[in-house]
UniProtKB/Swiss-Prot annotation:
This is Putative pterin-4-alpha-carbinolamine dehydratase. The keyword Lyase applies. Pfam families: Pterin_4a. Keywords: Lyase. Belongs to the pterin-4-alpha-carbinolamine dehydratase family. It catalyses: (4aS,6R)-4a-hydroxy-L-erythro-5,6,7,8-tetrahydrobiopterin = (6R)-L-erythro-6,7-dihydrobiopterin + H2O.
Length: 118
């Protein structure tokens, strides 16, 4: 549980099995903590589109996000376009969303908000 520290400061933990799949009440608590992210696929994933001025900045964000994904051992699905990236998180090992998805979503948002790729 990450209630005592901000999501972007938390780290992913190994999560396997349906015991770690988040229920509706926990999703309702976590979703407001990651503004701009939306539930997708009937609550099985979260997504957000990040927009950039050009392809260079788009790929810079993708590369920085790949570093975060490697460090956290939790990897998003990405749709990479000239001026945007669609990021999708879901935890396959739990069959839906886990806390790890929200931790990484917060880290991705922080990366974008800090303008690391500008």
């Amino acid at each position: 549980m990450t209630d005592l520290i901000p999501l972007e400061q938390a780290h992913c933990l190994p999560r396997k099995g349906s015991d770690h799949k988040l229920g509706e009440a926990r999703l309702a608590e976590l979703l407001p903590q990651v503004p701009g992210w939306e539930l997708a696929e009937s609550g099985m994933a979260i997504t957000r589109t990040f927009r950039f001025a050009d392809y260079y900045r788009t790929l810079a964000f993708v590369n920085a996000l790949a570093w975060i994904a490697h460090r956290e051992d939790h990897h998003p699905d990405l749709g990479v376009h000239y001026d945007r990236v669609v990021v999708r998180y879901s935890t396959h090992d739990v069959g839906g969303l886990s806390e790890n998805d929200f931790i990484c979503a917060a880290k991705a948002a922080q990366l974008f908000d800090q303008g690391i790729t500008a």
